[in-house]
Amino acid sequence: MNFKSIITAVAVTALFASNTANAQVNTIDSVATSKVQHFNFDDMVSKTIGEGIKRKWFHGEKGQMTIFNLEKDAHIPWHQHPNEQITYIMSGKVKIKTIIDGKEIFVEVGAGEVIVFPENVPHEFWALEETVDLDVHVPVRQDWLSKELPDYLKKTKK
């Protein structure tokens, strides 16, 4: 198993770990209450959602997974959401502005690194080079379910 597979497995595990308290165990003798979903990211079409930003994503009942392809100098503006966000940089490097210990700081996150944003912690991204970013959000981002982009994504610039 390669490193990316391990990180993806960890991200998926984290996605559902916070929801196991209410999980129902189904056996062959019980009625299934959830639908198993199976996706192939390679077969999914990326959608351009901002200047230099492409996204493909899916969601289950409790969380979602997203792959962002960021061109060098792409920018995701300052925003926050009521979802925990786990970001794994698969390739490339980003500069992130966020708040740690009550202080606004900048941190660079490169290939193989992970940063976790608790719910409602503001953050902003700049791609320092071409970057592939895997994000997991729990719960599902309700603002992404509509066809309309969130306001902060309408302000993306390169």
Segment roles from a protein language model:
Residues M1-I7:
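Bacterial N-terminal signal peptides that target proteins for export
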Residues A9-S18:
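Bacterial N-terminal signal peptides
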Residues A21-I67, E130, E148-K158:
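A short, N-terminal "cap"/entry segment at the start of jelly-roll beta-barrel domains
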Residues T66-Q80:
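Conserved short histidine dyad/triad with adjacent acidic residue
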Residues H75-I76, K95, V114-E124:
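Histidine-centered metal-chelating micro-motifs
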Residues P82-K95, I99:
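Glycine- and acidic-residue-biased ligand/ion/polar-headgroup-sensing regions
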Residues D101-E119:
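Short acidic-glycine-tyrosine-enriched beta hairpin
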Residues E119-D143:
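Ligand-binding loop in jelly-roll beta-barrel domains
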